[in-house]
Amino acid sequence: VNNQVTTDEVNSSAFEIDLLSFQLTIGSPIVVQIKHKEGCKPKVLNPEVVKPSASYTITSIASDADGKLTWKTTGESGTLPYIVEQYRWNKWVKVGEVQGKGTAGEHAYTFKVTPHSGKNKVRIKQVDNAGAKTSQDVPFTAKVAQVNYALDPAGKTITFTNTTSQPTETMYEVFDKFGNMMARGYSAKVDVSKLAVGTYYLNYDKSNAEIIIPKRK
């Protein structure tokens, strides 16, 4: 264990290693090496005990109108990423990650979310072997104009504009009728020239729309 030989009795078909005797601190690195004979590969029955756990406690979390999300935590137990999610299009969408510090002290984190128009909701979570541990929802109202879309008559380009008809960048997703994602990104235009004729579903800003790619000349 961390290059130290255990004093536990290991010359048997089943044995237990007592990690308490190594005086490890929560969140510190650990490497367990088991030397064995050829054809006698060991099986670890509870590997989760040396893996990071989502044990954090949030002491504060908030977002400003520009989407700057800040939070503080204590009680982390091992390095796990904080997954940042935003509620868009009637679902939670992953928008990024921040690597956790993994130790028990207080830690501060920041992530810039790209807001959509109007009221927003964001949250963070960590995922370990037991599942996901999710924070409360964090609401904020963004200073972002509503976005409109237009598909050109040739069915080759989707353009996003603001309320003054100026091109504006926004997050988007395009799905076919079977639910397969055909395009995803953040832009003022989407090239759909390679999509086959048919019906598609567009998610953009905070809205949804059905688009029809026409037969091209």
Name each model-derived stretch:
Residues Y172-M182, Y200-L202:
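Short, glycine-anchored, charge-dense loop/turn motifs used at functional sites
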Residues V84, I124, M171-Y172, Y200:
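Generic short beta-strand
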Residues P153-I158, V197-K206:
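Short, contiguous hydrophobic alpha-helices characteristic of membrane insertion segments
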Residues V1-A150, N208-A209:
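Short, compositionally biased serine/threonine- and acidic-rich segments at solvent-exposed termini, linkers
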Residues G100-G102, S187-V190:
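A short acidic/small-residue loop/turn micro-motif
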Residues L69-T73, I158-T164:
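Aromatic/hydrophobic beta-strand junction motif of beta-rich domains
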Residues G75-G78, T163-E173:
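A short beta-turn/strand-edge loop motif at beta-sheet boundaries
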Residues A209-K215:
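Extended, polar beta-sheet/loop recognition surfaces of beta-rich domains
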